[in-house]
Amino acid sequence: MARSFIMEAVMLAVHGQLLAPESPVEYIIPYTTILELYEMKDGSELIMPTPEDDAHVKNKIGELIAYFEDSFNKKKIEKALQMAWRKSPPLPINEYVTFTIIYAVENEEYGEVFDPIETELILTAIKEKSPLLTDQLDFLDKLIDAQIPIEVIDVEDFEFATEGDFLL
């Protein structure tokens, strides 16, 4: 059975190892984080610290956008967009990785401390009862400070998190 993780779409472009896990995983991705990919790809702001890494990641973002725009995948994603909190049918990537897109709705529940995308990630983790996978240490700190009742995993601990069942 696949282990589920909540995450932003851009994490797949930045952290290639997420597409090559040793056991099955399902990445539940809020739809608005897919929309962010367009801004990141075409924006002049650096995503990565060096121009070479930035160009590589922006190329990977372009590949992700093309994947999500593929007519077969686009139809599946559009099914999720028909109603709040609906999930798309699974989008298989390879033998071990499946994407599921969720039409998360930010309700300002955590709006004073967290931005809308962060709030969607939090609410999705709560609704899906799945851990949130992130590489943003400041977001991790805010989650801890606000005592948000979700499991959070730093991307550096991803391999450990996929090694069987455990409780944090």
Pin down the residues of each PLM region.
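Short acidic DE-rich linear segments
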Residues: 166-168
